[in-house]
Regions:
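Glycine/charged-rich beta-loop-alpha catalytic/anionic-binding loops adjacent to active sites
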Residues: 23-24, 49, 74, 96-106
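Internal, active-site/partner-interface "lid" segment
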Residues: 128-151
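Glycine-rich phosphate-binding loop
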Residues: 42-80
Length: 151
């Protein structure tokens, strides 16, 4: 996350979703603008620390996901944080990446945070059968909650 304020109401939902699947994860405050050395060190050690997917959330001039993607070959998922401009500034900063430096950008806010976790789970499910089974069960349960008729 780019700042501590990104946690409440947004990224806490990402973490809770990852916990539902038993996915071990770290939560850190790292800013592309204010703590670039911290970002470089984190990414330098990421693969050694067995990190397989990075979820980067930031608001306003949200460059965290893009800078992260430029410094690693690990999959980077970007979550734009809602802002005074309803998150549009964050969305555009996250999604508008040059060719060759991909960021998987999700929706603004809580929905994006939850979907970032689910996309990370999906990425990990390619390698880990137990994660795939949990994802299939989640999807099946999710489908059962949708009514067939409106009333």
């Amino acid at each position: 996350m780019g700042s501590k304020s990104d946690w409440l109401g947004t990224m806490e939902h990402c973490s809770n979703t990852l916990k539902q699947f038993g996915i071990k994860h770290e939560v850190r405050v790292i800013s592309a603008h204010r703590t670039p050395k911290r970002l470089h060190k984190f990414l330098k050690d990421a693969e050694k620390n067995k990190i397989e997917v990075i979820i980067a959330a930031a608001g306003m001039s949200a460059h965290l996901a893009g800078v992260t993607a430029s410094l690693t070959t690990l999959p980077v998922l970007g979550v734009p944080i809602e802002s005074k401009l309803k998150g549009l500034d964050s969305l555009l900063s996250t999604v508008q990446m040059p060719s060759g430096i991909p960021v998987g950008t999700l929706a603004i806010g809580k929905a994006g945070a939850i979907n970032a976790a689910l996309l990370a789970v999906s990425i990990l499910s390619v390698r880990y059968r137990d994660v795939l089974n949990k994802l299939r069960k989640y999807r099946s349960n999710f489908e059962k909650k949708v009514p067939k008729k409106p009333f």
